[in-house]
């Protein structure tokens, strides 16, 4: 087994610790998954003094400390996700952002949410390339390059790259419903806006010669969760895209999140994670024939016609967000937030086990909670599933969740065996 990648968690004293609940960064294969960073001073464990600017700076300092501690640099970051409490604070965050990314800019998602841990104003997360891989005692050359791409056929921004490819994944900036010709929001309501977001994603993928059905995970941020049905109507006209994908009814994994606000006062914003069989140099393009998408659903977790429970490509599995639904009844589990958190994690465990994996293979967990004060109760349940506190983690408070749930959880899982074509 020694020639397989291993889940590698790391922590440094120069950034806030996860109190045994999560690691600062978990590397697997060619990516480091960082826990979302709060504006906490590592020395004191308290929020930094000052306003939004000081808080944003502290988040980036913490990210930099983690990145430095694993012998990487800030330009190895392929995606940044910025969560703010107040969308008007984004300009101040951007001022700080520029000082940490003076030339190269990663792909980026910006969203305002209802609440953040410790009453912070901002929380920032980074995904970092890891060319050396994680095969124990056998580091790779680390010579993979990342490819950045922008097309005039989708909205451009000086603060983000439309897509950053590294190894077998493309990471797209979240797309707003902006008409690239005018630079303004498209006219119409949420359906027109959702259509424009998806058109922009399609334009970016076409510009790098990647089919739309190579998307493995979609994250939809909605200003009003009650718009979900309207967005689904548009969504189902885009997926599946090709005849071959329709033949197997392939749809990506998916998470829907209620945003307190979105940039430009948009009603919807859509983020895509995309498989990249061509790889990045010096990986050989023709090797793509040896890597395919594995999509999987199990009866032991709730099913949804618009999303696959887990989609694997190469060394990662991407899980759809799990609600606290009992898969047998399709109903919300009885009890409070602790029971709900437990059910979400049971569903994740059922999905993970259905693809012959174990919870130790989980590298990153994203928690969306209705009431941020509930996190102590959530953590009680969480610890029983992740006693070692290994996976990296992100927690955000949201104003609403599907089916009036109190919590929703999704996960990224390592996939050491890869995804060769099945005989």
Model-derived features with residue positions:
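N-terminal presequence-like segments and the immediate start of the first folded domain
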Residues: 1-61, 65-78, 84-199, 203-216, ...
């Amino acid at each position: 087994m020694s020639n397989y990648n291993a889940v590698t968690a790391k922590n440094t004293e120069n950034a806030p610790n996860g109190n045994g609940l999560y690691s600062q960064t978990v590397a697997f294969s060619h990516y480091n998954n960082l826990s979302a960073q709060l504006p906490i001073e590592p020395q004191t464990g308290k929020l930094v003094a000052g306003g939004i600017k000081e808080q944003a700076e502290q988040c980036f300092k913490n990210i930099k400390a983690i990145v430095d501690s694993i012998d990487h640099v800030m330009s190895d970051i392929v995606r940044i996700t910025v969560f703010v409490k107040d969308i008007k604070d984004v300009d101040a965050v951007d001022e700080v952002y520029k000082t940490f990314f003076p030339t190269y800019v990663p792909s980026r998602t910006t969203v305002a949410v209802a609440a953040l841990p410790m009453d912070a104003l901002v929380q920032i997360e980074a995904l970092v390339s890891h060319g050396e891989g994680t095969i124990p005692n056998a580091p790779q050359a680390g010579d993979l390059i990342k490819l950045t791409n922008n097309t005039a056929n989708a909205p451009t921004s000086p603060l983000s790259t439309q897509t950053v490819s590294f190894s077998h994944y493309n990471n797209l900036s979240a797309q707003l419903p902006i008409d690239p010709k005018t630079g303004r929001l498209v006219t119409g309501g949420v359906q027109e806006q959702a259509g424009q977001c998806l058109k922009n994603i399609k334009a970016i993928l076409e510009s790098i010669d990647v089919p739309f059905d190579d998307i493995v995970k979609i994250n939809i941020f909605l200003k009003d969760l009650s718009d979900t049905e309207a967005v689904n109507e548009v969504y189902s006209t885009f997926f599946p895209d090709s005849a071959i994908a329709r033949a197997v009814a392939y749809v990506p994994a998916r998470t829907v999140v209620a945003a307190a606000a979105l940039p430009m006062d948009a009603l919807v914003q859509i983020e895509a994670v995309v498989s990249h069989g061509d790889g990045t140099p010096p990986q050989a393009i023709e090797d793509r024939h040896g890597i395919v998408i594995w999509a999987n659903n199990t009866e032991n977790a709730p099913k949804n016609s618009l999303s696959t429970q887990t989609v694997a490509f190469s060394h990662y599995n991407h899980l759809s967000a799990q609600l606290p639904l009992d898969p047998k009844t399709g109903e919300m589990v009885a009890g409070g937030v602790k029971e709900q958190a437990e059910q979400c994690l049971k569903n994740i465990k059922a999905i993970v086990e259905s693809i012959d994996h174990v919870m130790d293979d989980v590298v990153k967990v994203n928690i969306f909670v209705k009431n941020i004060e509930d996190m102590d109760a959530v953590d009680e349940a969480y610890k029983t599933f992740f006693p070692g506190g290994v996976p990296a983690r992100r927690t955000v408070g949201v104003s609403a969740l599907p089916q009036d749930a109190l919590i929703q959880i999704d996960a990224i899982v390592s996939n050491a065996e890869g995804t060769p074509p099945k005989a």
